[in-house]
Amino acid sequence: MSNGTAVMGKINNKKTHIRCRRCGHHTYNVRTKRCSHCGFPAPRIRSYRWAKAK
């Protein structure tokens, strides 16, 4: 039982996101190994209709 809020205080000096090597945005999560902008390393680029401008 150590994956809650108490653990977050121990990782406050580390980087959560680094630059993604596919899209170039600063959205690659180091812990989950996934880019929140393009979905890397998934083979398809992440895109949703609600995210596009109307």
Swiss-Prot record:
Cellular-component GO terms for this entry: cytosolic large ribosomal subunit
Family listed: Belongs to the eukaryotic ribosomal protein eL37 family.
Molecular function via GO: rRNA binding; structural constituent of ribosome; zinc ion binding
UniProt cofactor(s): Zn(2+)
GO biological process entries: translation
UniProt KW rRNA-binding keyword: yes
Residues annotated for Zn(2+) binding in this entry: 20, 23, 35, 38
Listed name of the protein: Large ribosomal subunit protein eL37
Keyword Iron-sulfur belongs to the record: no
Keywords: Metal-binding, Ribonucleoprotein, Ribosomal protein, RNA-binding, rRNA-binding, Zinc, Zinc-finger
Physiological role: Binds to the 23S rRNA.
Zn finger limits (C4-type): 20-38
Gene3D superfamilies, A to Z: 2.20.25.30
Cofactor annotation remark: Binds 1 zinc ion per subunit.
